[in-house]
UniProtKB/Swiss-Prot annotation:
Record's GO cellular component terms: membrane
Pfam family for this entry, one: SLT
Protein name: Putative tributyltin chloride resistance protein
Species: Alteromonas sp. (strain M-1)
GO terms under biological process: peptidoglycan metabolic process
Length: 207
C-alpha cells in the first residue's frame, strides 16, 4: 500500500540530506549509468540504499554507497580485506552495483521493477513470488510478507522519482563536473582524517 505520509517525510529528508553528501559521488555515478545506457533513476539508488553515505554498514553486513553484501561484492570482484573495503570505494562499488543491476535486469526478462525489488529483497525471494503468481497462488502473500520491510524503500523510491521529475523542488544545484580522481599511491595510506589528507600536496590527480 502506498503511504503518502511516508512519501512526504522522505521527500523532506532527501532535501535535508543535501547535495553536500551526494556531491562527491553523483557526477561519477551519473556518468557511469549513462555510459551503459541504463535508466538515469539508478543513479539515485545510493540515496535509497545508504543516503549517499560511503561508510554505511548494515546489520546484514552490507556496506558502502550501494550496500553491497560480502557475497555480491566477491562475485563481482570487489576486494574486501582488513585494510581495504572496495564496497566503500565509489569506483569499485559503482562498477559492481551496475554490473549487478544489469544481471538482475536480464534475469528478470527486462523488468526493472522486479530487478530493483530483487536488489532490495533478494533475487530468490522475488523469483519465488513470481512463481507463486504464475502458479495462481495468492499474489498478496508476497505483498503482505514484504510490506513492512519494503515500505520505506518504496517511499524513498517514489520520492526519488519526484526529484527527477521536479528537480528544482528538491536537490540544490550540483556542479556538472568531476569531483573525484584516481590518485597513485606507493604504499598503504590511512585516510580516516579526510581534512588532513585533502590538504596534502602530494595527492594530486594523474593528468
Amino acid at each position: 500500500m502506498y503511504n503518502n505520509a511516508l512519501h512526504g517525510i522522505y521527500l523532506t529528508q532527501i532535501t535535508w540530506m543535501k547535495s553536500a553528501r551526494a556531491e562527491p559521488y553523483l557526477y561519477y555515478i551519473v556518468t557511469e549509468v549513462e555510459k551503459r545506457n541504463l535508466p538515469i533513476e539508478l543513479a539515485l539508488m545510493p540515496l535509497i540504499e545508504s543516503d549517499f553515505n560511503a561508510s554505511a554498514y548494515s546489520h546484514k553486513h552490507a556496506s558502502g554507497l550501494w550496500q553491497l553484501t560480502p557475497a555480491i561484492a566477491k562475485y563481482f570482484k570487489v576486494q574486501i580485506s582488513p585494510w581495504y573495503d572496495g564496497r566503500q570505494d565509489v569506483i569499485d562499488s559503482t562498477r559492481a552495483a551496475l554490473n549487478f543491476m544489469e544481471y538482475l535486469h536480464k534475469r528478470f526478462d527486462g523488468d526493472w521493477y522486479h530487478a530493483i525489488a530483487a536488489l532490495n529483497l533478494g533475487e530468490g525471494r522475488v523469483l519465488r513470488a513470481i512463481s507463486n503468481i504464475k502458479n495462481k497462488a495468492n499474489p498478496l502473500i508476497f505483498q503482505l510478507k514484504t510490506a513492512q520491510t519494503n515500505q520505506s524503500v518504496r517511499a524513498k523510491r517514489t520520492s526519488c522519482g519526484t526529484i527527477i521529475k521536479k528537480p528544482k523542488n528538491a536537490f540544490p544545484a550540483i556542479l556538472n563536473s568531476p569531483t573525484i580522481a584516481v590518485l597513485p599511491v606507493d604504499c598503504a595510506v590511512i585516510l580516516d582524517n579526510r581534512k588532513q589528507w585533502q590538504q596534502l600536496e602530494i595527492f594530486k590527480p594523474m593528468v
